[in-house]
Curated annotation (Swiss-Prot):
Protein name (database record): Small ribosomal subunit protein eS1A
UniProt subunit comment: Component of the small ribosomal subunit (SSU). Mature yeast ribosomes consist of a small (40S) and a large (60S) subunit. The 40S small subunit contains 1 molecule of ribosomal RNA (18S rRNA) and at least 33 different proteins. The large 60S subunit contains 3 rRNA molecules (25S, 5.8S and 5S rRNA) and at least 46 different proteins. eS1 interacts directly with uS11 and eS26, which form part of the mRNA exit tunnel.
Organism: Schizosaccharomyces pombe (strain 972 / ATCC 24843)
Domain of life (superkingdom): Eukaryota
Cited function: Component of the ribosome, a large ribonucleoprotein complex responsible for the synthesis of proteins in the cell. The small ribosomal subunit (SSU) binds messenger RNAs (mRNAs) and translates the encoded message by selecting cognate aminoacyl-transfer RNA (tRNA) molecules. The large subunit (LSU) contains the ribosomal catalytic site termed the peptidyl transferase center (PTC), which catalyzes the formation of peptide bonds, thereby polymerizing the amino acids delivered by tRNAs into a polypeptide chain.
Subcellular location: Cytoplasm
Recorded name of the encoding gene: rps101
């Protein structure tokens, strides 16, 4: 007779089932609020573990990076190849107040632009906004045929590429310097910088499909409650004295 445990036998008593706990029962949904310079303010919801003990749900949400399609933010499918990154700065009730944290292009759109018989020209420039953001702007463009050109290829010479790089740097500096982040985003959405580069480089070599490929935030300012409310169009006097004896306004 063999002596020892039979590993095939199940542990515990028969008939007792392990209790299944729904993981979503310990989580809460929070609304995501986009800054006021986008057309849509309520962009979705995010999930977080409910406050328990020393773990606070608000602390888990702060600093979270969310990626949203620009088409959803602007209600325009033409911007479906754009992605906007939003960073959660503060929590008000069940709402997450966010700030702009980056701009990107989808990989399928970028791959569709790269073709043979043309030169790809890229440049990037670091700029600082008036409200304290330090960001790097990446642009990309492609050479196109000249008017009445018979030649199949549109390859630019190295000297022309260097000249186009200089023009790209100048246009980015001229368009971005002296702008706040809100004003910069309002230029990025309609592709103002890309059109300005096409116009500035036309006499060197004609370009097509010039886009701001990416905006990377290198350094962001700290947002206090008042500035964050202004960013979301909910600015109000915080902590100001309330005067009860106020004369009623005359009807107009």
């Amino acid at each position: 007779m063999a002596v020892g445990k039979n590993k095939r036998l199940s542990k515990g008593k028969k008939g007792i089932k392990k209790r299944v706990v729904d993981p979503f029962s310990r989580k809460d949904w929070y609304d995501i609020k986009a800054p006021a310079f986008f057309e849509v303010k309520n962009v979705g919801k995010t999930l977080v573990n409910r406050t328990a003990g020393l773990k606070n749900a608000n602390d888990s949400l702060k600093g979270r990076i969310l990626e949203v399609s620009l088409a959803d933010l602007q209600k325009d499918e033409e911007h479906s190849f754009r992605k906007v990154k939003l960073r959660v700065e503060d929590i008000q009730g069940k709402s997450c107040l966010t700030s702009f944290n980056g701009f990107d292009m989808t990989s399928d759109k970028l791959r569709s632009l790269v073709r043979k018989w043309q030169s790809t020209i890229e440049a990037n420039q670091t700029i600082k906004t008036t409200d304290g953001y330090l960001c790097r702007i990446f642009v990309i463009g492609f050479t196109s045929r000249r008017v009445n050109q018979v030649k199949k290829t549109t390859y630019a010479q190295s000297s022309q590429i260097r000249a186009i790089h200089q023009k790209m740097f100048q246009v980015i500096q001229n368009q971005a310097n002296g702008c706040s982040m809100k004003e910069l985003v309002q230029k990025l959405i309609p592709e103002v910088i890309g059109r300005a580069i096409e116009k500035a480089t036309n006499n060197i070599y004609p370009l097509q499909n010039v886009f701001v490929r990416k905006v990377k935030i290198l350094k962001a300012p700290k947002h206090d409650a008042q500035k964050l409310l202004e960013l979301h169009g909910e600015s109000q006097d915080v902590g100001s004295k309330v005067i009860s004896d106020v004369a009623p306004l005359e009807s107009v």
